[in-house]
Amino acid sequence: SRGLGDVYKRQITESLKRCNVLKINDEELITIGRLFGYPGLDIENKCWLILGKYNLDMLVLTCGVNGSYVFAPGVKSFQETPKVEVADTVGAGDSFTGTFCASILKGKSIQEAHELAVKVSAYVCTQNGAMPQIPEEYTL
């Protein structure tokens, strides 16, 4: 009989074969690394491996206070997480992902989209609640 890990691995593999952009966090990357047999690789090498193996257009990795990365063929962007006075982290990840995707769809470069996503996410962390009013300077 197959174990639960085999089921997860199969489901994740099928999903990766169908996607062109993958957004994951550092904890999910560790899990994927364990499932697919490369737990010893560092963050960047795991991301490059997944990007190439599944022919992804882009892999976005968020690492909380340790920054975030965007990998695309021939491109790596890293942004540090700004130091802010945190009021509430609810909505930070969604605001990052939404801002990044909207920026790319509006024609921004990976670097520009990444920078804005980090700024908006950091701003959201300084506000109470998941859906604060976003300042004009951060809108597209």
What are these model-predicted stretches?
Residues 26-27, 63:
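Short secondary-structure boundary segments
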Residues 14-15, 52:
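Structural alpha-helical scaffold elements that stabilize or flank donor/cofactor-binding regions
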Residues 29-32, 68:
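A generic structural signal for short hydrophobic patches within well-formed alpha-helices
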Residues 36, 40-140:
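Conserved phosphate-binding/catalytic region of the ribokinase-like
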